[in-house]
Amino acid sequence: MTTHAPFRVDHVGSYLRPKDLVEARAKFANGEITREKLTAVEDKEIRELVKKQIAAGLKGVTDGEFRRAYWHLDFFWGFNGIEHRVGKHGLKFNGVETKADTATLTAPIDGHNHPFVEHFKFLRDLVKDEDVIVKFTIPSPSQFYFELIFTPENIAAWTSVYPTEKELFEAIKNAYVDVITDLYNEGLRTLQFDDCTWGALADDGFIKRFDADRPLEEVRRDFVGRALQLNNSVLGVLPKDLVVNTHVCRGNFQSTWIAQGGYEKVEDELLAGEYVNAYYLEYDTDRAGDFKPLAKVSDGKKVVLGLLTSKFADLEDKDEVIARIKEASQYVPLENLYLSTQCGFASTEEGNILTEEDQWKKIALISEIAQEVSGK
């Protein structure tokens, strides 16, 4: 068996939260149950989820992000020096707004004793006798940086601790290396950086929000350079036998989106320059553009085409998906192409607008298509 992701039948990582878990999290938030009781429910539901993933033929299993409210913020809150705060408003998606939670830097940061290490160890022990590996997902370093600069309040907070951006970057790098080293020492060999910054940087509207006074492309190049520098500063010092892949999307909250724009605007940095093994790329709608930027993918790197949507229940036409895979093979060799949904089924605890049965039908369709394309 291949010992790391991607796999021919693959997924991004998050799954719809079961009813019992949703209820337990609500009770914990209201002070009705203890942390220990919530953890017991989480453990139970993760065990069931792993069984379902294995039954569906997935070889890289996750915990569904069942211990998180958000795909990214819970990880940030695990750093020493970061506080969970509530801002003035949430992120405005297409027709809906998230809760106003944020991560604010209030003291020098480090990644020692990060709670996600225990999350990994539970999953590791759960599958130790199975013919699968653990794929562990965390937000990218660049995603952390963009959280810290997204509001004036967060900017004021970090600049009171780190006088320069150079010092902040070094602190972020070291904090990430702290956590990843601990994960590696506990046995992790496949890590996934989830990263919405590239999708935002491909969107002209987002670029204008970062800096409306300078020329748009000048601002884009500036921030794209920062994202690449920060991610590679971490990737470049990790153990060689730790496989790190990255997932790029344009927002996934209650079946809506937040950004649009093709990869051509970030292709040199993302597809040619980032030190990752594989790219999980959103491609379920025209908002992601065409396949031409894939020509920039470095030799030997793998691309997981997110051609099926995790946002809605309707199943894609198998022949159309196969035709798109063949189209993409003009730019990346077919043996280096893989298939998944464009994102997870529940990037936040609210989840997308489909049922648990629907999400497994999507995985089954991925399996069917992958077998037909590979001939196995």
Predicted regions mapped to residue ranges:
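Domain-level signal for soluble alpha/beta catalytic cores
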Residues: 1-376
